[in-house]
Amino acid sequence: MKKYLLVFLMLICCGLSVMAQQQNEGGKTRPKVGLVLGGGGAKCAAAIGILKELEREKIPVDYIAGTSIGAIIGGLYAQGYRADDLEKLFRSQNWLALLADRDTTLVGKVYKEEDGVIYLFGFPVRRKADADKNTGFWMLHGDHVYNFLDSLVSRSPVQRGTVKQAIPFSCVAFDIRRQREIVLDTGSMARNMRASMAIPGAFKPVQIDTLMLVDGGMSNNLPVDVVRKMGADIVIAVDLQQRKHDDYRSPFGFLKGLGGILDWLAERPDIKKYNVNRTKADLYINPDLGSYGVTDFNAKAIKAILKIGEDTGILYRKQLGMFMKDHQR
């Protein structure tokens, strides 16, 4: 008799639990939210301000896809770093030195020659003809930024156990051998992020098996389609481009040196895919960054770009607040 009574009570408890859950959710299930962070160099600081507003409005993020520095911000966010953590990171880092593989031990020296490479104020500027070719020149190895990313991932909130689970994350790179887009979602996250931001002509490509990978902005700078395939029902996309190029005019007019290449990667991705992707986002956020560019990593500019991002997030506060309610089903 006691045995049957125990089973009966358990069934009642289970039933009440299900009823309570349905009552709390109003019989609706929450859609899966995908976050897309486009590339844009220093301008990606604006995305951090927008992330702050997502957190304030308690918008859950179930999937993340990013390109170039958007992959770095997205990857770290997926590993449990929050917007405040990322803001401190952006404010405290000397990004130009980090990205340029600058040897900080040589900063105080105007001229230094080491292993056949000539440095000015710590920056590699010329390789002698008889120098070891493996030292590289005009092709930054990206060792500093890789080690930096690897250290951040290895001691992330997820790895330390303060955040239970990582958010599923994918980033986009471009295989220069086969001339095609590659989506990276397995293996070393630091390596994947490093591949996604390997600017052609500036950074050494990242080799994974037979793939030779460079910056994903070559093929897909706003990977809305990628996060959809991951399983997102609705997509919030943060686009840092200021030129939309709908008319396809003068496609290579501003390719002038490395600065032009950086601009091209930030402003001239695969045009057809980009124009489709930005219209496929459920919530498309494009902060007005004025004249700030991809290389504006100085402290004053970063502070201003972060503020623009926060102000943009505030402008979208009402939309974000209603977002989940409107999309529940």
What does each model-identified segment do?
Residues M1-Y4:
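Positively charged n-region of N-terminal signal peptides that target proteins for export
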Residues L6-G15:
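Bacterial N-terminal signal peptides
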Residues A20-T67, G75-R329:
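Patatin-like phospholipase
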